[in-house]
Amino acid sequence: MKMKKSTVKIQKNEASMPLFKLFLHCGIAGWCFEILYTSFKMLQRRDFRLTGTTSLWMFPIYGCAAFLRPLFRVTRKLWLPLRGTLYALIIFFAEFLSGKILDKKELVPWDYSRCRFRVGPHIRLDFFTNWFLAGLFLEKFTLKDGFRKL
């Protein structure tokens, strides 16, 4: 019996890293970006200590981006604004879902209940641009084996 070839072609310079290892890379990258983001937010308050923060709970949430690698392989030829929008919507969904799960044990490290453009306490619509860009970064990051080929 002859096996049918996959319809998604993997390019030569593309992801071969095992999923668990990529999960670790995505978790670390997510932590780093969150620490940088929260550090730069301190500048708005004129606090030049630039103290960045994150939560241990965020590591597995960020790590789950590794599971998007098959999607990135399929969508990488689509129009860039369409891809970015799709990725932002997926991140909004992941943020909502992980927020709901962590909320059950009162462990959610973020609270948007006082923010202007929020959907419930877990999603901020004004983060759309952040998630659009983060999704495009993750596409490149996961398809290039995380930190190994970045």
What is the role of each PLM region?
Residues 2-150:
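Aromatic-rich, lipid-facing transmembrane alpha helices and their immediate juxtamembrane interface loops
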